[in-house]
Amino acid sequence: MAKYCDVFTVGGTKVGALFGEAVVINNPELNVRFRYMIKQRGGMLAKGRLLGIQFETLMEDGLYFTIAKKAVDQAMRIRDALLKKGIPLYVDSPTNQLFPILTDEQAEALEDDFDLAVWERVDESHAAMRVCTSWATEDAAVDAFIRAVEAL
């Protein structure tokens, strides 16, 4: 997919990086003075090249994808449980981020034990909620979330 984009970002924290996102510029015309534009607008970190080392390491030997696979697999388990329960998705995401459309009552019940965020109000009684997994999401946490979804 990257070959079809002029510019895209690669997130780091969901795969265990300290912080940050890598900006990948495929179109050389857009790279002209990009570094200076970031610096002038306050987006360049001091010693930021050191942070780049984490991305260089993550891109070696498919490590990024190996780590990300766990997050995606956990999200797919949750997705399957949501769909089995008849809960629609705002978008059918193949990533570690899910956006189930919950009633306000369902969201309230899940928020008692889980950290959800309202992504967008769908109507007066439904919201698309953001559910996100990471490299550190444990099976027990996903199992508990699935049980809570089944109990809705």
What is the predicted function of each stretch?
Residues M76, A81-E150:
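Conserved C-terminal alpha-helix-loop-beta "cap" of PLP-dependent enzymes
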